[in-house]
A protein has these predicted regions:
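Active-site loop-to-helix "anion-binding N-cap" substructures in soluble metabolic enzymes
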Residues: 1-168
């Protein structure tokens, strides 16, 4: 009714400060889809999970839970943002290789759930400390369709620099 088109779900800060769970993310996703909006579902692992080699397990659990009871037709409208928690607001960022590996793995999980055609239609973004200097190379990765930009989007100079980097 008020023109909202996109809704971010499962952001790490919502999970940390408000106790949002995989189950509540799923319930919200179903509501967002049923109301004609596009969900951007955030998934990602903590530093401890990353260092323990559990990244794939963590994101698979989050993706499978988020898509529970979502039809293939609705799944095509979903955006998934991989945001490694250890990279948010820390100045650390996953290498392009790590980001591509995890985003490709996420696409594979969607393919397991719905088939390759749906997986190719789902947009997958990277959202861990995206900066102008790293954006263009990140978006050249085959399984990264965009970026979920946080803090850098709050500074005009940084945001303009990102746009300019894409135009180079």
């Amino acid at each position: 009714e008020i023109g909202v088109e996109w809704v971010i779900l499962g952001h790490s800060e919502r999970r940390q400060y408000f106790g949002e769970t995989d189950e509540t993310v799923n319930l919200k996703m179903l509501q967002v889809l049923n109301n004609g909006m596009t969900p951007i579902v955030c998934v990602g692992e903590s530093l401890e999970e990353y260092e323990a080699g559990k990244t794939h397990d963590v994101v698979k659990t989050q993706v499978v839970a988020a898509f529970k009871d979502v039809t293939a037709e609705a799944a095509e409208r979903v955006v998934i943002a991989y945001e490694p928690i250890w990279a948010i607001g820390t100045g650390k960022t996953a290498t392009n290789e790590i980001a591509e590996d995890v985003c490709g793995y996420i696409r594979g999980v969607v393919a397991e759930l719905y088939g390759q055609d749906v997986a190719e239609k789902v947009r997958i973004q990277y959202g861990g400390s995206v900066k102008p200097a790293t954006l263009k190379a990140l978006l050249e990765q085959p399984n990264i369709d965009g970026a979920l930009v946080g803090g850098a989007s709050l500074q005009v100079e940084s945001y303009v620099a990102m746009i300019e980097a894409l135009n180079d």
